[in-house]
């Protein structure tokens, strides 16, 4: 009915519904129905040749209304008829009568209308969003926020009229919008995601695109149409972004990385002498295995220019995730204050020729000032530990000497503990503490960290008694040992050889 009103040249179509009597009245101020007899003929359109060629009406719109009510009255162009819908559907004869003093308003009244009031409201609100003429429900105009005349900036294209959300005048182009909505003859026919999400709007050319009968709510060859729409959106978006590049300063344009990426226009950054912050990260703390989480890297917020990179003021490295390449490369990057290249740029971007590839180069670990070795056994990790003054990491021609942070060498299954680290954080480099169900076991990790901390203190203490006390477990669960004194004897390998109670 809305489509018929639009085709009739109406400026508005109104719906009035009285729930108590289930009476729906539809009115419009269009040119009216030329022939009520044609209206009652299945699959015969009463529209002129121009509309038939442009929009291909098939004469089934009115027929569908007959299935939704019990009785119908139609009044238009000085003629009217009334009939039970079951009689019309049975093709019984209908008497068409003249109307005295017709007021110029086409009126269709449906009695015994089947849908509920809320259904009617929800349905009309959805249909009105992109409709080209005013839609009124119970004297209240419905929102038409996606209509061509809604104040949005539409561009004429080969597929129809296109509005690019975020890339129109005075809109925030940094606001990334992945959704789009397709309308045909003002009615919705496709949504890339939920309809409630605002996004790009395309009013398809009805001479090129068609919808399936009888409801016309689905496109014919939908997959092909959607693919073409995506190509046009990408092309139109690129044109807008090229214009923005000419208008904005390099730092401001680089801020649009996510938008450029969404439109497949990252190549527009190739000659911009400022790096987007989205492509850079830094190792923000002692690096450990991440498992299902990602927390080793933080976004580098400071601006980095092409000059910073070319002069060596800033060094940027390629580095795969911790779980793939291990601790040594990450410790090297952390202690060398390297920035990490973490997101993709176009293959022709100037930065790619100046990256330090930490993944491809071998890393050499040198232990300096080794004192002794001991075996650590926690709940989830166990390995030999080497205690030393410091250790050196070398990649290519660059090296770093570390004396305050322990390292787990997964190749040698070895904890390297320099004199400046008495914490247990290094166990996190040997295990992510995620089980086979990807659940993080915080209590086990904390227990292993505490045990390793005691293990380090015990192995670096100059007082043997203090070292022993650190290594002894808790005896809270054994009351028989409370308030007792014991003498322990250890053998040459550190195993308990004898325990004697002192009375």
Language-model-derived ranges and their functions:
Residues 1-17, 61-66:
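Conserved ATP-binding N-box helix of the HATPase_c
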Residues 118-237, 260-313, 318-321, 326-327, ...:
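GHKL/Histidine-kinase-like ATPase module
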Residues 72-74, 90-137, 142-145:
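Flexible, glycine-/charge-rich segments associated with ATP-binding catalytic modules
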Residues 21, 31, 35-39, 46, ...:
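Charge-rich (often acidic), low-complexity intrinsically disordered regions concentrated
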Residues 18-24:
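Short beta-strand-loop-beta element adjacent to the nucleotide/active-site pocket used for signaling
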Residues 31-94:
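Flexible ATP-lid and adjacent glycine-rich G1/G2 motifs of the Bergerat
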Residues 28:
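Conserved active-site aspartate in kinases
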Residues 12-16, 71, 125:
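Short, surface-exposed charged micro-motifs
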């Amino acid at each position: 009915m809305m489509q018929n009103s639009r085709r009739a040249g109406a400026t508005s179509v109104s719906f009035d519904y009285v729930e108590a009597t289930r009476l729906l009245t539809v009115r419009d101020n269009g040119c009216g129905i030329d022939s009520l007899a044609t209206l009652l003929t299945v699959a015969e359109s009463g529209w002129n040749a121009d509309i038939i060629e442009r929009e291909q009406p098939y004469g089934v719109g009115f027929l569908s209304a007959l299935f939704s009510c019990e009785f119908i009255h139609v009044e238009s162009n000085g003629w009217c008829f009334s009939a039970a819908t079951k009689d019309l559907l049975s093709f019984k004869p209908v008497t068409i009568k003249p109307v005295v003093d017709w007021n110029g308003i086409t009126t269709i009244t449906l009695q015994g209308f089947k849908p509920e009031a809320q259904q009617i409201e929800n349905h009309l609100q959805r249909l009105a969003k992109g409709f080209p003429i005013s839609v009124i429900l119970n004297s209240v105009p419905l929102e038409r926020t996606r209509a061509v005349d809604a104040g949005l900036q539409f561009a004429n294209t080969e597929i129809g009229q296109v509005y690019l959300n975020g890339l129109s005048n005075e809109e925030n182009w940094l606001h990334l919008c992945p959704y789009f909505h397709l309308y045909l003859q003002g009615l919705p026919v496709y949504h890339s995601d939920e309809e409630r999400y605002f996004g790009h709007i395309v009013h398809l050319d009805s001479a090129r695109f068609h919808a399936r009968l009888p409801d016309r709510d689905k496109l014919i060859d939908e997959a092909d149409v959607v693919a073409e729409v995506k190509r046009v959106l990408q092309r139109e978006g690129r044109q807008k972004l090229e214009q923005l590049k000419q208008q904005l300063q390099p730092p401001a344009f680089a801020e649009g990385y996510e938008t450029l990426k969404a439109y497949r226009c990252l190549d527009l950054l190739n000659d911009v002498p400022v790096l987007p912050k989205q492509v850079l990260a830094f190792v923000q703390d002692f690096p450990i295995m991440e498992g299902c989480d990602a927390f080793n890297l933080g976004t580098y917020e400071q601006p980095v220019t092409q000059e910073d990179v070319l002069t060596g003021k800033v060094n940027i490295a390629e580095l795969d995730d911790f779980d793939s390449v291990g601790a040594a490369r990450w410790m090297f990057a952390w202690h060398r204050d390297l920035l990490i290249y973490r997101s993709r740029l176009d293959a022709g971007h100037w930065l790619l020729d100046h990256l330090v590839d930490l993944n491809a180069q071998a890393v050499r670990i040198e232990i300096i000032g080794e004192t002794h070795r001991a075996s650590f056994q926690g709940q989830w990790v166990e390995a030999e530990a080497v205690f030393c003054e410091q250790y050196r990491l070398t990649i290519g021609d660059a090296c770093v000497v570390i004396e305050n942070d322990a390292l787990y060498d997964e190749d040698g299954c070895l904890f390297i503990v320099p004199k400046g680290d008495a914490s247990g954080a290094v166990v996190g480099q040997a295990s992510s503490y995620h089980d086979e169900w990807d659940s993080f076991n915080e209590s086990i990790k904390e227990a292993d960290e505490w045990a390793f901390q005691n293990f380090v203190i015990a192995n670096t203490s100059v007082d043997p008694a203090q070292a022993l006390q650190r290594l002894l477990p808790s005896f809270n669960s054994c009351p028989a040992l409370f308030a007792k004194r014991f003498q322990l004897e250890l053998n040459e390998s550190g195993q308990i050889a004898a325990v004697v109670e002192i009375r």
